[in-house]
Structure formats: C-alpha cells, structure tokens
Amino acid sequence: LSLSGMYNGEMISAPEYKSLASLDGAGFHGGYNHIVYQMVGQPLGVFYLPHSTGLESDGNGGYTYGIADLNGGGVSLEDGEDRYVAGQAVPKTILGSNISFRYKRFDLSVQINGAFGHKIYNGTSLTYMNMNIFPDYNVMKAAPKQNIKDQTATDYWLEKGDYVNFDYVTLGWNVPIEKVQKLKKYVRSLRLAFTVNNLATISGYSGLSPMINSSTVNSTLGVDDKRGYPLARTYILGLSINF
C-alpha cells in the first residue's frame, strides 16, 4: 500500500517505507543499518527487520548473523524483501504516579514512571559485540568469546522494553519542636528529609537503561544507539527550618 494524491495539480505521494531510526558511528560504514520505519498501515515507528536464525560460523573461527529467507526468493535485506514488522518502538502504555504516605510525624513520597508494550533495539550490543571493530574501538567483555564478526542489523538484538522506574523516594521527619525547650523559643518548625533519586529500575532489558529516546529526534526512535548514559543515583539530605 502507498499514499498518493494531488496538490495544486502536482502529484504527491508518501513512501511505503520511510526509515525513522538507524545506527551509525563505530563499526558502521553504510549498508543495511535502518531499523525503525514509518510504514503505511502500521503504527508510527515500527521495527522492520530481517529475522535472525542465530549465529552461524563464517568458516574462519568467527560468527555472523544467520538471516531467514522470509519470501523464499533468496536472502535480500532490501525494503519489501526479507524483512518483517517485529514490534513497535513507541510504548503502548505509559505510567506516571506520585504516591504519598503520612504517619504521625513521618511522611514518605514515591514517584514512579514506566512504559510498556514496546521494544528496544540494543544497538550498543550490536556494535560492541562486533569483533571487527577491535582494536580501533573497545568491545564488550563477552565479545572475544562469542567472536561475532558482523554488524548487520537484524532482530537478534531486539528486546522487550517494558520497565518500571522509581524516580525518587523521599522520607521526611517533622521534629517535635515543642519538646525541645531551647529550640521552641526560636524555631516554629523543623523538618529533616532524605531523598534518593533514581532508586531502582525494574526491567528485563539487558542494556544500560531502558529509558531511551521515544521520539524521532536525532533519528534514534526506539534505538539504544550506544550514545546514551544511564542516570546516576543521587542522595540528598535536606533540612527545612521555619523561624
């Protein structure tokens, strides 16, 4: 299917396959590195990839990604050939919640976010598990053992992207000023608080973080493109005084 029409007497049309996200940089020198597409009849941002049958020996001690012949006409990585829609990059469900508890002089606040129903392409593993880039680039610890010598983007590194992230947790204590005679004269209220940012992330994703770009900015929609860095966990101790 395709979309076409007329505007001011000129024929216009939308391509059947339009790449939205791809990989470049270390180990990529052109070729079939397009991963996420805009396609007629599909949700915005779908993974349109060759299907990998696993690792195959290259006959020289290394391994390459076996590719399935989906259309029975011989393996071809061109759009419309041996590729299939393997999932979507945009989450189907997004979670955001702020929960607060209070007990006597203690209070607890928790902020949670999450996303479900989408997939992530682990471009970091595709790139740095490829021994062909070594020693020009560093590789992962497991790379020499697996000895993969291939950079072809298939569904081999496509993973579920579901996650729940505890954005922050804050525990507070309102000090009973009325019981401290020396402070009672000068201080109206005193509160101590301890906050942990980025406490934990629950996810089956094997990369550094499932919280990657979910837009078409920089053509990285749904792709862990090896440039991201996980958010650091920080600890904050706070003191609030009202005179």
Predicted segments, located by residue:
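C-terminal beta-signal and terminal closure region of outer-membrane beta-barrel proteins
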Residues: 23-53, 149-153, 203-243
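Extracytoplasmic gating/loop element in the C-terminal half of outer-membrane beta-barrel translocons
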Residues: 57, 61, 113-199, 204, ...
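Transmembrane beta-barrel strand/turn architecture of Gram-negative outer membrane proteins
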Residues: 1-41, 93-125, 169-175, 189-199
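Extracellular/periplasm-exposed beta-strand and loop segments of Gram-negative cell-envelope proteins
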Residues: 16-18, 37-40, 82-88, 123-128, ...
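Residues that define the transmembrane beta-barrel architecture of outer-membrane proteins
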Residues: 91-95, 162-167, 188, 231-235
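Conserved small-residue
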Residues: 1-89, 197-199, 204-207
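Generic recognition of flexible, low-complexity loop/linker segments
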Residues: 84-85, 95-98, 180-182, 224-226
